[in-house]
Amino acid sequence: MIIWIASYPKSGNTWVRAILCSLLYSSNGNLRLSELEKINQFPMKNHFTDLTDDMFNIEEIAKNWLPAQKKINLDNSIKFFKTHNAFCRYKNFVFTDKKNTLATIYIVRDPRNIISSLAYHYSLDIDSAKKMLFSSKRVLGNETSYKSKGHVYTVLGNWANHYNSWKKLDPENTLFLKYEDLIIDSKLQILRIANFLKKYLKVNFTDSVIENTLLSTEFNNLKFLEKRNGFYESVTNKITNKKMNFFNLGK
């Protein structure tokens, strides 16, 4: 079964995945950025290779959302997946269902603060970033990202619809995190995440793991780790063609 780490882009998804990886996969809570690769993204090309040959047809991708997830869940193990997809229907095809989804962690960020992050990450001017935020028909994915990273179409929609689509899920199995709360009181939010995980996994986190997770996922440390070792999610500026830091301002 899948536990989703869902968010609108540039809302703190990577930060939360860093916390999860620090808690679950690191040595005593001491994160290495490479460990984030243990939480894959959905949808991606490899999820659909034996389901469709038409990777550039958004309806084909939507039609196979559930079959792809059913394939992922064949081994009956719990898996974490990052997604920026809205919890939506496309041409009557639903993104996920209770047969495939165990739980969801959704991260929400003040949309006013997302705009500058979108502009930086996607090499947009501020007006274009605003249009992206408010576009009800926004879809992520293109031939370049497909060839370079295996990305297929992600149905995004606008910020409000995206948030509301995930908000309607079963509250018992959904943890909502605010990006701003992660900044104000990181330890409290880490404890909320840890307690949520205990509902689904046989895990116990010592005080030292919690403290090390707090320290190793602090923004300045993430920035340091990226500078020292690089980060696979960093992007290239489309105007200057230079590699940009993924961890930019952290505000």
Task: Name the predicted role of every residue range.
Residues R17, R112-I115, K187-A194, D207-E211:
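An amphipathic alpha-helix signature
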Residues A6, D170-F196:
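Phosphate-binding beta-loop-alpha motif at adenosine-nucleotide cofactor sites
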Residues Y25-G29, Q189-V203:
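Non-catalytic, well-ordered alpha-helical segments in soluble enzyme domains
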Residues I210-K251:
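PAPS-dependent sulfotransferase catalytic core
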Residues R32-L36, N204-T213:
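Short, glycine/acidic-rich hinge or "gate" loops at secondary-structure transitions
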Residues A86, D110, E180-L182, S216-F219:
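Short, solvent-exposed coil/turn elements at secondary-structure transition points
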